[in-house]
Structures are given as structure tokens and as C-alpha cells.
Amino acid sequence: FDCKDNSTSLPESLSLQIFNSKNHIGPSDLASMADNATNNEIIYASESINGSVWGARSNSDDVSLNNVTIQSGNIGEFVYGAYTDGSGKIATQNTINLTGGTIGYSVYGGYSKNGSAENNSVLMQAGDITNYSVYAGYVDSGNGSVQLNKVTITGGNLHGTNSGVYGGYSSSGLVKDNTVEFGTAGTPNAAGAPTVAGVLFGGYAAESGGQATSNTVTMHNGQVKRIYAGQVQKGIGNATGNKVYLHGGYVTE
């Protein structure tokens, strides 16, 4: 794999902190350094690791402008474009490009434990995800906003019966203007089109108080179980202005 800064020089202590504990791979400021985790690139084309891959990981700061490409190999756990545990911190403009390989668990473009996630993206062109889901923008807890994130899937497969594809996911915050683009335009029943054993969600709020607004799912081909442009799963919340565009493919339920 390669790890590099595309535009500015990272502190040596950050740029060289590549973890192999449990075979995790990625730069991290787990010592809570003051620097934001930004402008890293990971290109993974190895055989297999038991753990996860991330473009950046921080205990205390924003994470932005990081990119992860998975070309081949077997990753036992998760893939993150960037991940922050910092309270109120933002994951923004992080990207993942999947062109091959097998991933055991979920994929997150930008993951914030208790902040916000904006303008993150995942592009899946090939490969397999054995369990769980793909998220462009994800906030694990609290009412942080998740906006303007996008998942594009033109090939590959998500196999788990509980799998899902989420443009944006928040625990109880505003989930707005997120997008899922599934399949390839102009080829409604093409061989090799992507498949998802589970569900497509443009925007998803898991808890009461969440809002799912103006999210979009567009399906061109391939196969999925169900489609929801916007959903608030529990309690009291609003799902408004969400849209599904179905141009081809198969929705099995």
C-alpha cells in the first residue's frame, strides 16, 4: 500500500504512524495531536489483512480530504475514508474507490462518532462486501447533520441479507441532500450489473428526532431487495421531499 500527502507535508509523527496492530492499516493521530488528519491517500492492493483500512483516524480532530482505493486483496473488517472520535468534529470530503477485492464488514466514506459528515463519497466499481453495508456519510450518535454525501455503485456485490447502501446515515440528526446512484445509465438489464441483498437508502435517521429530507436514489440496473429514498426508523421524525428514480433493474420485494 502507499500512504502519501497530496498537497501539504504532514508532521513526520503523523505521516509515519502506520498501524499493523491486528493488521490495521492507516495513518492516525491516536495520540491526540493537534493536527487535523487530512490529505492522506491509501492505495491497497495486497493479499489479505485481518483488520481494517482507513485513510485517516483521529481521536480529537476533524478529518478531511482523505482517499482510500481498494484494488484487490481481502480485508477482514472495515474500510474508512476517514474516521473521527472527536466530539462535535466533522468528517468531510473523504472518498473511497473500490475497484476489486473482498471486504468483510462495512465501508464508510466519512465516519464521525458524534459530529457531522458532509460531502463524502464512495464509488464501488467491482469487488465484494461479505457482510453489512456501504455508507458515504455516517454519524454514529447524537443529532449531528449528514449532508451532501454520495454513493455510486456501478459493479460488485453486497452479499449480507441485512446489507444496505446509505447515502447518509445519522443517529438522530438532519439527513439531507444525500444521493445513491445504483447501476449504469443506459444499460437497464446488463450482465455484470451490481447486486445488493439488502436495501438502498438515500438518507436514513435511526432514532426519534431525526429528519430525512431531499435525499435521492436512482437505480439504472442491477438487483436490490428494497429502496427507500428517506426514512426515519424510530419514534417521531420527518421524512420529506425524498425521491426515487427507477430506470431499470430488479427490486425483489
Label each region the model flagged.
Residues F1-S52, R57-F78, T84-S106, S112-S133, ...:
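Surface-exposed loop/turn motifs in large extracellular/passenger domains
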